[in-house]
Regions:
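Macromolecular interaction modules
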Residues: 1-241
Length: 241
């Protein structure tokens, strides 16, 4: 099977609750009719409206949702896009190669998944869209992301799940030039908004916090331009696993 990711922007001014209901109640069943075999939707809704402890330098429009889906043939994207158009979404589609670095229950920070398909996951999601700096070859960029940043962040941060998606191909005209899409689950809002938890600095250890922030900044800036990192908090709905 092939994994596709669609980044969605809802019509300007549309309430997040309307976006969620449209995606879950109307778009979801039609996607199965279009041949989608597995589906997770990440939605910027009222349950995920929080600020990160990480600095945010990008000031462009926030994304409304991400569709993460599996199909048996990439040509299915044409049917999928007709469905998205019916919801009046602006969208960008990509073929990706997924690698799960940490699964639910894969570390001490969270338990194995024990909730059913269709129920909102008891975590806070962070979806990050990444562009490769032109000064780095694609090979070197992936090496720094997978070989350095992933283990550095895993050792430091209390994530529940970490999925890396390397973009293989853009499906839609004028799609932003993202080459990586990260799906991170955090055990709670507090783990994402409290800098001491977010950076693995323990209980109010300001020296460890400063050291870890510096280490993270060096690791991230070695493969990304900070002002181009787009990160959004979302709710996760695993709909068909």
């Amino acid at each position: 099977m092939v994994k596709l990711i669609y980044i969605l922007w809802a019509p300007k001014g549309q309430p997040s609750q309307t976006t969620r209901e449209l995606l879950l109640n109307k778009i979801q069943p039609r996607l199965y009719d279009a041949g989608v075999k597995k589906l997770t939707i990440y939605i910027d809704d009222e349950f995920s409206n929080v600020r990160s402890s990480a600095p945010k330098l990008y000031s462009g429009p926030e994304i409304s949702a991400e569709l993460s889906l599996w199909v048996d043939n990439v040509e299915r994207h044409l049917e999928i896009e007709i469905i998205l158009q019916s919801g009046l979404f602006t969208y960008a589609g990509y073929v990706v190669e997924e690698s799960i670095y940490t699964e639910y229950g894969g570390n001490k920070h969270f338990h194995k998944r024990d909730w059913p398909d269709g129920q909102r996951s008891p975590v806070l999601m962070a979806i990050t869209l990444m562009e490769r700096p032109q000064k780095l070859s694609r090979e070197e960029w992936i090496k720094r992301w997978h070989g350095t940043q992933s283990p550095v962040s895993e050792a430091m941060q209390p994530r529940a799940r970490y999925i890396r998606n390397v973009v293989l191909q853009a499906l839609t005209p004028d799609a932003p030039p993202f080459e990586g899409i990260v799906e991170e689950a955090w055990p709670s809002v507090k783990h994402y908004t409290n800098p001491f938890l977010f950076y693995g600095a323990g209980k109010m250890n300001v020296f460890k916090l400063a050291a870890n922030m510096y280490r993270m900044l060096r690791s991230v800036s070695a493969f990304l331009e900070l002002n181009k990192i787009r990160s959004s908090t979302m709710s996760e709905y695993i709909l068909k696993s």
